[in-house]
A protein has these predicted regions:
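Short helix/loop capping segments that flank catalytic or ligand/cofactor-binding pockets
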Residues: 19, 101, 126-127
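Active-site beta-strand termini and strand-to-loop segments that position acidic
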Residues: 90-96, 118-120
Length: 240
């Protein structure tokens, strides 16, 4: 109904993450793990943490990989470890397909999450599960009540488990490792583009030696300077 996919718009806007007040008895590592929302080595920052779900949807629809991305981001709150609280990005995919993405975690703003898939003939909207023509007129509308009467199971999480158990019983392989890795790397390349202010390519990120893990994986005190806030336009991360 929508024809060949030419572009998409993905967004995820919500309030701020929880801030964990540090207790005196916590080591640096325990503090970061308990407040994992606020440290990029634990939660991956907002693109990998939130927008990735809609990136995954777009990748599934198109069955394409991104060629490159240019992104930017910043942080309004300063007491949130080393993560940003807003990002914006522009992906170029194979075959000239484009994806615009935005994610924000700031209180007091208008919120919402979803994706629009734009085709040559029309568009699909996750907000109301509708298909619209180029004039914006709805030409198809998902009917949840009709779906309930047609299918015995309609909960997506239950369907996932049914598919998994079905493959186990049949002795067949259910392997989504590549699709999961593709979506994860798509999110990471956008984050790294925003952190550095540089355009990132799929080749760069898929062969990158990037390792964000602490030097010592134990509940001990560490040098927190190694977890500085990324500063675009510089070769290294820097403190606020």
């Amino acid at each position: 109904l929508i024809g060949s996919i030419i572009s998409g718009y993905a967004y995820y806007h919500t309030g701020r993450d929880q801030y964990i007040v540090r207790r005196p008895e916590w080591s640096d590592m325990e503090y970061m793990i308990r407040g994992h929302f606020n440290w990029n080595w634990v939660n991956g920052d907002q693109i990998s943490n939130m927008l990735i779900h809609w990136i995954d949807v777009f990748n599934w629809f198109t069955q394409l990989k991104p060629v490159n991305v240019i992104a930017y981001g910043s942080r309004i709150r300063k007491n949130i470890g080393n993560v940003y609280d807003n990002f914006s990005m522009h992906f170029e995919y194979e075959n000239g397909v484009m994806l615009e993405g935005m994610v924000r975690r700031i209180d007091g703003c208008d919120n919402g999450a979803g994706i629009v898939i734009q085709g040559e003939k029309g568009s699909w909207h996750s907000s109301d599960f509708s298909i619209r023509n180029r004039n914006g007129e709805t030409i198809w509308q998902y009917d949840p009540e009709a779906a309930k009467s047609k299918f015995k199971v309609h909960d997506m999480y239950t369907l996932e488990h049914i598919m998994l158990v079905d493959h186990i019983r049949k002795g067949t392989v259910l392997n989504i490792a590549e699709t999961a890795a593709t979506s994860a790397l798509t999110a990471v390349m956008a984050r790294e583009s925003a952190y550095t202010g540089k355009r990132y390519t799929w080749q760069q990120i898929s062969s990158s030696p990037l390792n964000m893990l602490p030097e010592q994986m134990a509940l001990v005190n560490v040098d927190l300077k190694q977890f500085g806030v990324p500063l675009p336009g510089t070769a290294f991360i820097a403190d606020d």
